[in-house]
Amino acid sequence: MGKDTIADLLTSIRNADMNKKGTVRVVSTNITENIVKILLREGFIESVRKHQESNRYFLVLTLRHQRRKTRKGIYRTRTFLKRISRPGLRIYANYQGIPKVLGGMGIAILSTSRGIMTDREARLNRIGGEVLCYIW
């Protein structure tokens, strides 16, 4: 039985966000590095650094916490992450069938023949692929 490193990455970020942690440490693989680069570029995390411990590499992510003020006080905005395609049920979409997350407000991350990219990049390049996760 294999490990789902993408689900581990998303769960670690989600748990750290719910517990108001500033940093998260996740195992570094090629897929997780590409997903973290997309999250950094889209502004969901602040910074990334690679850390080595006894022959294993880890990514240390600094989360972005936004605060907004309402009548009842200050509250934190949350980052929602949802795994779509999983090892037991793969979900594929052609470029015309790539879903828009929250009407274009969120992003979908796809694994295509040209690498891991967002839904907007895949539509511009007119290529489809496996829908890995939604982020909004």
UniProtKB/Swiss-Prot annotation:
<keyword id="KW-0150">Chloroplast</keyword>
<dbReference type="GO" id="GO:0005840">
    <property type="term" value="C:ribosome"/>
</dbReference>
<keyword id="KW-0934">Plastid</keyword>
<comment type="function">
    <text>One of the primary rRNA binding proteins, it binds directly to 16S rRNA central domain where it helps coordinate assembly of the platform of the 30S subunit.</text>
</comment>
<keyword id="KW-0689">Ribosomal protein</keyword>
<dbReference type="Pfam" id="PF00410">
    <property type="entry name" value="Ribosomal_S8"/>
</dbReference>
<keyword id="KW-0687">Ribonucleoprotein</keyword>
<dbReference type="InterPro" id="IPR047863">
    <property type="entry name" value="Ribosomal_uS8_CS"/>
</dbReference>
<dbReference type="InterPro" id="IPR035987">
    <property type="entry name" value="Ribosomal_uS8_sf"/>
</dbReference>
<dbReference type="GO" id="GO:0019843">
    <property type="term" value="F:rRNA binding"/>
</dbReference>
<dbReference type="GO" id="GO:1990904">
    <property type="term" value="C:ribonucleoprotein complex"/>
</dbReference>
<dbReference type="GO" id="GO:0003735">
    <property type="term" value="F:structural constituent of ribosome"/>
</dbReference>
<protein>
    <recommendedName>
        <fullName>Small ribosomal subunit protein uS8c</fullName>
    </recommendedName>
</protein>
<comment type="subunit">
    <text>Part of the 30S ribosomal subunit.</text>
</comment>
<dbReference type="InterPro" id="IPR000630">
    <property type="entry name" value="Ribosomal_uS8"/>
</dbReference>
<keyword id="KW-0694">RNA-binding</keyword>
<dbReference type="GO" id="GO:0009507">
    <property type="term" value="C:chloroplast"/>
</dbReference>
<keyword id="KW-0699">rRNA-binding</keyword>
<dbReference type="GO" id="GO:0006412">
    <property type="term" value="P:translation"/>
</dbReference>
<comment type="similarity">
    <text>Belongs to the universal ribosomal protein uS8 family.</text>
</comment>
